[in-house]
Regions:
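Conserved positions in beta-strands of structured domains
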Residues: 14, 106-109
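Mixed-charge, low-complexity intrinsically disordered regions
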Residues: 1-101, 113-230
């Protein structure tokens, strides 16, 4: 039986990431990352959020809108395996899927009433680009959603060690104080593709309206420049 379903975004995420580069590979890896969930006008009804304040964490169901493809492949190359080993798409969290749907667990830091955007959700630890469409929100329920005994397959442990981050004082001054911890956390996760390890190469990405450039040698990441994002 052939079926199709049409869905529309209920909200959009507003985060510090203007591009995919730099976005943490999973939610919760950088707890200090702040973002907001702003509902579409049709769904700005406070009754729909009644009771959500009692939960510390929520699930975001969202769309890989930057990775939509007409065709799909049954196997993909997970970056954490070096980009050479193929695994079944349903054994990975690759964005290149038959239905480009994603799931992120984030901390609900607060709910704020605004005059022009209705109730806005303040969240921590998100792994989404700015503007990402949200399809649904569900509460995280510890007794049902937490499984400490679960096996993690080829992703049983975090991907690699965190890096030592060096930001020269004159560059750190360019970063707003309320973004410094988050920036360090993002850089410590090593934003580079896993298969790239050129100590001479300078990488760059947009974060909180800034263009951050860095290089990595061994286990140390050094920020080379911070400027206003164009």
């Amino acid at each position: 039986m052939h079926q199709e379903f049409t869905m529309r975004p209920i909200a959009r995420i507003h985060s510090d990431f203007s591009t995919k580069f730099g976005v943490p590979r999973q939610s919760g890896l950088v707890d200090s990352l702040e973002a907001t969930v702003v509902f579409e006008p049709e769904f700005r009804n406070s009754d729909a959020l009644r009771g959500l304040e009692g939960f510390s964490h929520i699930w975001l169901v969202w769309v890989f809108d930057q990775a939509v493809r007409k065709d799909w492949s049954p196997t993909v190359r997970p970056p954490r395996l070096g980009g050479n080993t193929r695994m079944g798409v349903f054994a990975t969290r690759s964005p290149f899927r038959p239905n480009p749907i994603a799931l992120s667990c984030v901390k609900l830091a607060g709910m704020e009433e605004t005059a022009d955007r209705g109730t806005v959700l303040r969240i921590l630890g998100a792994d989404l680009m700015d503007g990402t469409p949200i399809l649904d929100i569900k509460p995280y329920i510890p007794y049902a959603d937490s499984h400490p005994e679960a096996l993690g397959g080829f992703a049983a442990v975090p991907a690699g060690e965190t890096l030592e981050v060096v930001i020269p004082p004159e560059l750190l001054e360019k970063v707003p104080e309320n973004r410094r911890e988050a920036l360090r956390g993002v850089l410590a996760q090593d934003p580079r593709p896993h298969y790239q390890d050129d100590p001479e190469r300078v990488y760059g990405f947009g974060f909180a309206g800034m263009e951050v450039k860095f290089s990595v040698k061994g286990k140390q990441l050094t920020v080379r420049d911070i400027s206003s994002e164009i």
